[in-house]
Amino acid sequence: MQEEWLFINTHKNNPYYNMAMDEALLNLVSQGALPPVIRFYGWAPKTLSIGYFQKLEKEIDLDKVNAGGYGLVRRATGGRGVLHDKELTYSVIVPESHPMMPESVTAAYKVISTGLLEGFKNLGFQAEFSVPRTKEDRERLKDPRSSVCFDASSWYELVVEGKKIAGSAQTRQKGVILQHGSILQSIDVDELFDLFIFSSERLKERMKRSFYSKAVSIADLTDEEITIAMMEEAFYEGFEKGLDIKLKPFEVTAEIEQEVSVLIEKYRSEEWLKRR
């Protein structure tokens, strides 16, 4: 009999709510109050999220972010900057002790990302796992030249035709794995790169050309319109098949929303945003 996990779709929300909900669910799974959870969500306004270890004022053009009315939030996970707009965002929250979850981060990535792989298959795309093949590729992951996510594929992220199509980040806290990531419906590369600081315009253009060669969205792969609703259905079924689980739709309770409202203040605070 398949194990039952909870499924939550919170749709579009502000960036502080999105990050607070991930943390609240992590806490509840850690306490044993909830079984493993898969959540889908979106962003309003469109938002630049930065990794836990990124240096805000060194890497991000805050004037452009503010002038454009973008949301801005620091994630609890590592990785690089992501502009969240036309995408389906997912999070998987599961105990480290779960029999399905390997101890190593990269191996756990592969298990969780199997759900993404099956989701892309449901949409008709032959995605595959990226594996950095050379020592140079592996070293580059440790010391990335770019602040922009999707500029390179990490271990077991998803690529189509050699280009990264889903970017994910993972953290482990309180005995729980939280992996969340972006599945790109479409992307505006010029808009994305305008939000980051580069030492010269020449470097910016070079990095942008490199990005075009390494990243792709669903809209780049097909003339058919793939809606967010179609993506939700494809990846819902993909996670069920890839992880061999049964998803049970779950409505967020008032108690969970109360914890989220407290955590929102953390993610909204200058202290959290400017911690590095």
Curated annotation (Swiss-Prot):
Residues 32-247 form the BPL/LPL catalytic domain. GO terms for molecular function: lipoyl(octanoyl) transferase activity. It catalyses: octanoyl-[ACP] + L-lysyl-[protein] = N(6)-octanoyl-L-lysyl-[protein] + holo-[ACP] + H(+). InterPro entries: aa-tRNA-synth_II/BPL/LPL, BPL_LPL_catalytic, LipM, Octanoyltrans_LipM/LipL. Its EC number is 2.3.1.181. Pathway: Protein modification; protein lipoylation via endogenous pathway; protein N(6)-(lipoyl)lysine from octanoyl-[acyl-carrier-protein]. The active site is at C149. Transmembrane segments: none annotated. GO terms for biological process: lipoate biosynthetic process; protein modification process. The keyword Nucleotidyltransferase does not apply. Keywords: Acyltransferase, Transferase. The record marks K164 as: Lowers pKa of active site Cys. SUPFAM superfamilies: Class II aaRS and biotin synthetases. Pfam families: LplA-B_cat (PF21948). Monomer. In the reaction, the free carboxyl group of octanoic acid is attached via an amide linkage to the epsilon-amino group of a specific lysine residue of lipoyl domains of lipoate-dependent enzymes. The reaction proceeds via an octanoyl-thioester enzyme intermediate. Catalyzes the transfer of endogenously produced octanoic acid from octanoyl-acyl-carrier-protein onto the lipoyl domain of GcvH, an intermediate carrier during protein lipoylation. Belongs to the octanoyltransferase LipM family. This is Octanoyltransferase LipM.
